[in-house]
Amino acid sequence: MTVMSGENADEASAAPGHPQDGSYPRQADHDDHECCERVVINISGLRFETQLKTLAQFPNTLLGNPKKRMRYFDPLRNEYFFDRNRPSFDAILYYYQSGGRLRRPVNVPLDMFSEEIKFYELGEEAMEKFREDEGFIKEEERPLPEKEYQRQVWLLFEYPESSGPARVIAIVSVMVILISIVIFCLETLPELKDDKDFTGTIHRIDNTTVIYTSNIFTDPFFIVETLCIIWFSFELVVRFFACPSKTDFFKNIMNFIDIVAIIPYFITLGTEIAEQEGNQKGEQATSLAILRVIRLVRVFRIFKLSRHSKGLQILGQTLKASMRELGLLIFFLFIGVILFSSAVYFAEAEEAESHFSSIPDAFWWAVVSMTTVGYGDMYPVTIGGKIVGSLCAIAGVLTIALPVPVIVSNFNYFYHRETEGEEQAQLLHVSSPNLASDSDLSRRSSSTISKSEYMEIEEDMNNSIAHYRQANIRTGNCTATDQNCVNKSKLLTDV
């Protein structure tokens, strides 16, 4: 190895074998110098050799920045030593050689290779490309409010795992949702059901009919429902004013479900008040039909649990990622229903006791047969109809089985991504900086070696520099174009 300081470069150029006539421009000398410079990298005993210009393509990385890699230099062996994973470095070095292409070796686990990417500081862009190649779905960024109190409120209501009070609020919210769903179901029991078509009781006193009309505001179910709606409204309003973006707030499907969950209550309340004030019996039947439809919307409150349930979130993400496969499944079922309903109709057309009066009437039979449900309310009686029914069931099994592996694969991906430990969580939320400041480097250096050890290494390196410079000058085996220069900001080695 030949090592020399930048301040002695002119002296070395005067030695035998170094041109002095100026026939070679300095720029050309510098280019040849850069071309011939090589560096040895030792990865746990396995030595790699490459050119410095290859590493210099990415100056913000650990190997591409001379200051960053300086603390790993071994002056006695004239190489950089890293006690890291060997198989991973093949891909790391190829990243420099290929100009930015990163491929994980098949024998290196995903989390281990991610740690190597972070150690060599390849940057967030390289990590994102790596995750994309590995099949990771890019997660949406979730910005936080800028104001401190607004951020605290947002974390309190939006992220239950952020603090203890946030968990308490999440538990209260889940309990209120469950109570609301239980009330929605219990009020339909015959023993507790209040007939909305006639909300009153008749008593006869001295040949006089007295009608006592029940008041909805005294109904226990309505009172409990009101308390639940108060909590839902409070939670929605607080999260709206604390959210970082009002536009993104309304784009979130969960917030849309929250709004839909409370609208039926206010519509029902307004309708009841209008009926009591107007007392128009002619419009009562119409309003009751509308109210029944509106009350049905309350069942969507069960989806509010997905805000606090990882399982429901995984299911939703799986369905969202599998929309193409689900669309193909529905399309195949649609084709099968048309084909087999038509076939069974014509196969049973001559049968007097046929259950299939028309092709649309046979749609139901085709659907339940292809999904292998088979209610038995409609069935073929002829031999031809039974053959069609058998083919319909077989085709249904094959049709449903085709997209299932893709959907299961998506579910496994989202499930493992949500349930794996902190190590995988760091992989999915990695944010490695592109640049490291000198203060960070000094802190990391101090944590690696002590000051006395560093001074000893520096002294040995200076002695090595002087030794190799004198040896090369005496032998005259090196020229100015293949000399290695060492100064305060740059360390170059030649092997």
Curated annotation (Swiss-Prot):
Q: Where does this polypeptide localize?
A: Cell membrane; Membrane; Cell projection, Axon; Cytoplasmic vesicle
Enumerate the residue ranges of region (S4-S5 linker): 310-323
Q: Find motif (Selectivity filter) and give its ranges.
A: 372-377
Where can the motif PDZ-binding be found? 493-495
Tell me the keywords, alphabetical order: Cell junction, Cell membrane, Cell projection, Cytoplasmic vesicle, Endoplasmic reticulum, Glycoprotein, Ion channel, Ion transport, Lipoprotein, Membrane, Palmitate, Phosphoprotein, Potassium, Potassium channel, Potassium transport, Synapse, Transmembrane, Transmembrane helix, Transport, Voltage-gated channel
Cite the effect that the entry attributes to H355Q. Answer: Is not blocked by the scorpion mesomartoxin
Q: Which GO terms describe its biological process?
A: action potential; axon development; brain development; cell communication by electrical coupling; cellular response to magnesium ion; cerebral cortex development; corpus callosum development; detection of mechanical stimulus involved in sensory perception of pain
Q: Name one GO cellular component term.
A: paranode region of axon
Which is an annotated GO molecular function term of this record?
voltage-gated potassium channel activity
Q: What is its main location?
A: membrane
List, alphabetically, the Gene3D superfamilies matched.
Answer: 1.10.287.70, Potassium Channel Kv1.1, Chain A, Voltage-gated potassium channels. Chain C
Q: Would you say which domain of life the source belongs to? A: Eukaryota
The segment annotated Disordered runs over 1-30
Record InterPro entries: BTB/POZ_dom, Ion_trans_dom, K_chnl_volt-dep_Kv, K_chnl_volt-dep_Kv1, K_chnl_volt-dep_Kv1.1, SKP1/BTB/POZ_sf, T1-type_BTB, VG_K_chnl
Q: How is it modified after translation?
A: Palmitoylated on Cys-243; which may be required for membrane targeting.
Annotated stretches, region: Tetramerization domain: 1-128
Q: Where would I find glycosylation on this chain?
A: N207
Intramembrane portions: 360-371, 372-379
Transmembrane segments in this chain: where? Answer: 165-186, 221-242, 254-274, 288-308, 324-345, 387-415
Keyword Isomerase in record: no
Lipidated positions for S-palmitoyl cysteine?
C243
Q: In which tissues is it expressed?
A: Detected in hippocampus, in the middle third of the molecular layer of the dentate gyrus and in stratum radiatum and stratum oriens. Detected in the mossy fiber zone in the hippocampus CA3 region, at or near axon terminals. Detected in brain cortex, at basket cell terminals. Detected adjacent to nodes of Ranvier in juxtaparanodal zones in spinal cord nerve fibers, but also in paranodal regions in some myelinated spinal cord axons. Detected in juxtaparanodal regions adjacent to the nodes of Ranvier in myelinated axons in cerebellar white matter. Detected in sensory neurons.
State which ranges are Cytoplasmic (membrane side).
1-164, 243-253, 309-323, 416-495
Q: Which family does it belong to?
A: Belongs to the potassium channel family. A (Shaker) (TC 1.A.1.2) subfamily. Kv1.1/KCNA1 sub-subfamily.
Subunit note: Homotetramer and heterotetramer with other channel-forming alpha subunits, such as KCNA2, KCNA4, KCNA5, KCNA6 and KCNA7. Channel activity is regulated by interaction with the beta subunits KCNAB1 and KCNAB2. Identified in a complex with KCNA2 and KCNAB2. Interacts (via C-terminus) with the PDZ domains of DLG1, DLG2 and DLG4. Interacts with LGI1 within a complex containing LGI1, KCNA4 and KCNAB1. Interacts (via cytoplasmic N-terminal domain) with KCNRG; this inhibits channel activity. Interacts with ANK3; this inhibits channel activity.
Question: What name does the UniProt record give this protein?
Answer: Potassium voltage-gated channel subfamily A member 1
The species this protein was found in: Rattus norvegicus
